[in-house]
């Protein structure tokens, strides 16, 4: 028995019956609050369920529907809907956020994590921001060259949208129009076809997907490829957030 186990046992021994009852009651309250919060989140996620471009909530839910029965690892730092809708129960299911919040982190980090997961046969999955991938697109070639199994699902909102939102907030705070906030941060004209980009580097791909009804089949196909030990990218054109 290690020292931490001994410490835990001693804490249990010294915990009184009244304290254990207090812990139980607090646990019940927290469980009820969690259940209520999850119910609210599911209701929020239903907004724009059939919208095109695809809602980011539906993208996360469609992924979860097929991942929850697998041994999976979420290997990127984008966490909004996954953290609210997925059931994270193991330490390896989330690798954490980028420490400095720098753009260009997600693709190299997720492929590196997928390499680490390869020996365990886990399904590594990444929801990949489009602007972030444009900083280091060569990471796709690395995944193909070294046969790193990873499912990369693009959140393709056709902009460096973190920056767009920042300037929208700044414009509104100063009473100015937000019409010009996409200038310098848009990724359209021409639109980027990430499926073709991936294919050009040897990565299997689907998309661009604009109809959410096409997601399930593409995800199923992608998981099958990853189980064969290969990378796969699904280009999903999404709502901004």
Enumerate the language-model features and the residues they cover.
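Active-site diphosphate/adenylate-binding microenvironment
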Residues: 28-117
């Amino acid at each position: 028995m290690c020292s931490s186990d001994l410490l835990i046992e001693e804490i249990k021994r010294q915990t009184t019956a009244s304290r254990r009852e207090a812990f139980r009651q607090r646990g019940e309250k927290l469980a009820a609050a969690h259940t209520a919060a999850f119910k609210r989140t599911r209701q929020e996620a239903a907004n724009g369920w059939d919208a095109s471009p695809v809602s980011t909530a539906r993208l996360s839910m469609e992924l979860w529907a097929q991942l929850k029965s697998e041994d999976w690892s979420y290997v990127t730092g984008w966490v909004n809907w996954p953290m609210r809708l997925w059931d994270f129960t193991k330490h390896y299911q989330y690798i954490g956020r980028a420490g400095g919040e720098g753009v260009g982190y997600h693709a190299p980090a997720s492929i590196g994590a997928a390499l680490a997961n390869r020996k365990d046969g886990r399904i590594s999955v990444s929801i990949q921001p489009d602007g972030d991938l444009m900083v280091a697109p060569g990471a796709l070639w690395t995944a193909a060259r070294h046969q790193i199994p990873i499912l990369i699902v693009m959140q393709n909102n056709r902009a460096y949208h973190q920056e767009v939102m920042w300037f929208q907030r700044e414009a509104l705070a100063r009473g100015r129009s937000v019409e010009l906030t996409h200038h310098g941060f848009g990724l359209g004209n021409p639109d980027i076809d990430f499926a073709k980009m991936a294919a050009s580097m040897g990565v299997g791909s689907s998309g661009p997907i604009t109809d959410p009804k096409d997601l399930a089949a593409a995800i199923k196909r992608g998981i099958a490829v990853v189980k064969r030990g290969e990378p796969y990218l699904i280009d999903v054109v999404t709502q901004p957030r």
